[in-house]
Regions:
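Active-site-proximal catalytic alpha-helix in oxidoreductases
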Residues: 2-27, 31-44
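NAD(P)-dependent Rossmann-like dehydrogenase/reductase catalytic/cofactor-binding core
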Residues: 37, 41-129
Length: 129
């Protein structure tokens, strides 16, 4: 449960950004790519507030501002946005599995409603997508 929810904390912001650029990840801006990582961090914090155990070393620290893991994650997001790997790993799935992403979005919204965690990057990406 922890691994799956922590994984989806990263997948959904990627999907939102993908929808915002009609599946063309190479069109994402620096700000959108930064918000993907910010939104994943916000979501890990929300999961913890909802009582979901989150392995900080494997998840939260990867997205926390100022960490070495964050820099690596930002580089990975850039690389995925600029190569065919991102198309295969993110765009193709997000664009073909819209109902699955909607289900995950609704499930995370319901979980989030049980917390008071502010998620500004998440909300902005979600609205754009």
């Amino acid at each position: 449960d922890e691994w799956l929810k922590s994984h989806i904390a990263f997948i959904l912001p990627c999907a939102y950004a993908c929808y915002a650029v009609d599946g063309e990840l190479s069109r994402t801006t620096v700000e959108q790519r930064r918000m993907i990582v910010d939104a994943a961090w916000e979501c890990c914090e929300m999961l913890k507030a909802a009582g979901v155990p989150v392995n900080d070393a494997e998840n939260t620290d990867r997205y926390r501002e100022g960490t070495k893991q964050r820099k690596k994650t930002e580089r990975m997001v850039y690389w995925m946005a600029q190569t065919v790997v991102g198309k295969w790993c993110i765009s193709d799935h997000a664009m073909r599995a819209v109902s699955e992403m909607q289900y995950l979005d609704e499930a995370f919204a319901a979980l989030r409603a049980t917390t008071l965690v502010e998620m500004t990057a998440w909300d902005e990406l979600r609205r754009a997508g």
